[in-house]
Design a protein with these regions (language model features):
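Flexible glycine-/small-residue-rich
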Residues: 92, 218, 241
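Transmembrane alpha-helices of multi-pass inner-membrane enzymes
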Residues: 313-356
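Long extracytoplasmic/lumenal interhelical loops at the membrane interface
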Residues: 224-259, 282
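Glycine/serine-rich anion-binding loops at beta->alpha junctions
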Residues: 91-101, 143-145, 224-229, 318-330
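Transmembrane helix boundary and interhelical junction motifs in multipass membrane proteins
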Residues: 146-151, 227-233, 243-245, 262, ...
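Short, small-residue-rich loop/turn micro-motifs
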Residues: 13, 220, 224, 310
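Hydrophobic alpha-helical transmembrane segments of multi-pass inner membrane proteins, especially
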Residues: 2-16, 21-214, 250-308, 335-339, ...
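Extracytoplasmic/periplasmic regions of membrane proteins
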Residues: 214, 218-221, 228-229
Length: 363
């Protein structure tokens, strides 16, 4: 129900924030309704699949995802938007391979840890090999460039290794080294480094680097407790760039007020906690890690978007699950919800005796 409520909220705010952007006031809402229908259909299919049967195909799924990320970098196939090549043309629609690649990595990593459960404490099979896979996906995403999604992918991958039983003595130095390299890459990128300096002093940079964030803060301030009313916000009139995508939560705050923003955050929290409560019934390490990784994708992406829009994190283009306009992320969320229903049905069978899913983590 939380996912449905968030999607309905997203449709209402999307229509309000895009009604004046095109000659056809229903242009965006019609496309989003198509995406919602596809996400529901895909989620239903996933909820009926036998995930154990699909496990051997996880390498193929991951390989296809990696090829799709490579295709994005090929001129003529990949589409450059706002200086980044993250999209591919799919007939009349565009797709963002990095969205579905995140889940492909989760699926493959869960399968790998499951079949190598006894070897997860080892250096090579338990750490170096899976890290190479995580690193490959991360590098392909950085090449777009998309540092935020690459960081999200790396964090989720490392969390899964930790839950799968990889040794902290290998993980901690590698994580610190990776964080240092990531910071160095950002420092050498004028655009992304500029976002950080603008974030640190929004008032001084409100005319350029922090303009978008400044307008988002104004939107929240204008909305107050009860909002100015659906369709009555000023930020929908092109003051706030990307108001219907990455910064749509600011429109929620302006038009519906603090109470609705708190309700939306609560819905995300309930959705995540409900999934966590279900993890204890996982019959094996594969199921445990697949669900844990999927929930982490949902939770971290939500937290990053909310942090950016409220000025708690530097500006980063990342969709808000269920609410932002866009098909790729909505399909990803449909798959994740389908996985939740799938595991809920499969793990609730009375004759299914849960086995130990989480290995002891050794330092």
């Amino acid at each position: 129900m939380c996912a449905v409520a968030l999607t309905v909220l997203g449709l209402a705010i999307l229509f309000s924030s895009t009604v004046s952007l095109k000659a056809d006031p229903y242009f965006f809402i019609k496309r989003q309704l198509v995406f919602v229908g596809l996400a529901v259909a895909l989620g239903w299919v996933v909820s009926r699949l036998d995930l154990e049967y699909l496990r051997p195909y996880s390498w193929i799924i991951a390989g296809v995802a990696a090829l799709a990320l490579l295709a994005v970098l090929i001129p003529g196939i990949g589409v450059r938007v706002n200086g980044a090549r993250r999209w591919v043309e799919l007939g009349l629609m565009r797709g963002q391979p990095s969205e579905l690649a995140k889940l492909a990595m989760v699926f493959a990593l869960a399968h790998y840890c499951g079949i190598n459960q006894r070897h997860m404490p080892s250096l090579v099979r338990g750490f170096i090999v899976p890290c190479a896979g995580i690193g490959l996906f991360g590098l392909l995403i950085i090449a777009e460039p998309d540092f935020g999604t690459a960081a999200l992918t790396g964090v989720v991958g490392f969390a899964m290794l930790f839950l799968g039983g990889a040794r902290l003595r290998y993980m901690v130095p590698t994580a610190l080294g990776g964080l240092g390299l990531f910071a160095l890459a950002v420092w050498h990128d004028p655009v992304r480094f500029g976002r950080i300096t603008a974030f640190l002093d929004v008032e001084a940079n409100r005319a350029d680097g922090a303009y978008q964030l400044f307008q988002a803060i104004l939107a929240f301030a204008s909305g107050g407790l009860d909002g100015v009313g659906l369709g009555n916000g000023r930020q929908q009139m092109a003051f706030l760039p990307e108001a219907h995508t990455d910064f749509i939560f600011a429109i929620v705050g302006e038009e519906l007020g603090l109470w609705f923003t708190l309700a939306a955050v609560t819905a995300f929290a309930v959705l995540f906690c409900a999934g966590l409560a279900h993890l204890r019934r996982a019959p094996n390490l594969f199921g445990y890690l697949l669900m844990a990784g999927s929930l982490l994708l949902l939770a971290l992406q939500s937290l990053i978007n909310l942090g950016v829009v409220t000025g708690s994190l530097p500006t980063k283009g990342m969709s808000l699950p269920f609410i932002s306009y866009g098909g790729s992320n909505l399909l990803l969320m449909g798959i994740i919800i389908g996985l939740v229903f799938n595991t809920r049905r499969e793990w609730s069978r009375p004759n299914l005796a849960p086995k130990r899913a989480l290995m002891e983590v050794s330092a």
